[in-house]
């Protein structure tokens, strides 16, 4: 299931960098993290859903690439984001 529009808007409002920001790395990572969390819960009850598991792995890879990009352009924004989202060490 895709994210509900209201939840998506809430995440965009929380992580945006300027008024009309919807595509900054921070927003994209936040949206991907929400979808990853949803799918992780889904797999707790649907253990044999291998088709969706592949989609989850693609989302995790996409988030990893965005985080790597963010780390190369601005270390401070990267650290702030991972602290806010509660990912990484």
Curated annotation (Swiss-Prot):
UniProt GO cellular component terms: cytosolic small ribosomal subunit
SUPFAM superfamilies referenced in this protein's UniProt entry, alphabetically: S15/NS1 RNA-binding domain (SSF47060)
Source domain of life: Bacteria
Keyword Flavoprotein part of the UniProt annotation: no
Record keyword Zinc-finger present: no
UniProt cross-references to SMART domains, sorted A to Z: Ribosomal_S15 (SM01387)
Keywords: Ribonucleoprotein, Ribosomal protein, RNA-binding, rRNA-binding
Name of a matching Pfam family: Ribosomal_S15
GO function terms (MF aspect): rRNA binding; structural constituent of ribosome
Gene Ontology biological-process entries: translation
InterPro entries associated with the record: Ribosomal_uS15, Ribosomal_uS15_bac-type, uS15_NS1_RNA-bd_sf
Subunit annotation: Part of the 30S ribosomal subunit. Forms a bridge to the 50S subunit in the 70S ribosome, contacting the 23S rRNA.
Family: Belongs to the universal ribosomal protein uS15 family.
Function: One of the primary rRNA binding proteins, it binds directly to 16S rRNA where it helps nucleate assembly of the platform of the 30S subunit by binding and bridging several RNA helices of the 16S rRNA.
HAMAP family per the UniProt record, alphabetical: Ribosomal_uS15_B
Name of this chain's protein: Small ribosomal subunit protein uS15
Species of origin: Anaeromyxobacter dehalogenans (strain 2CP-C)
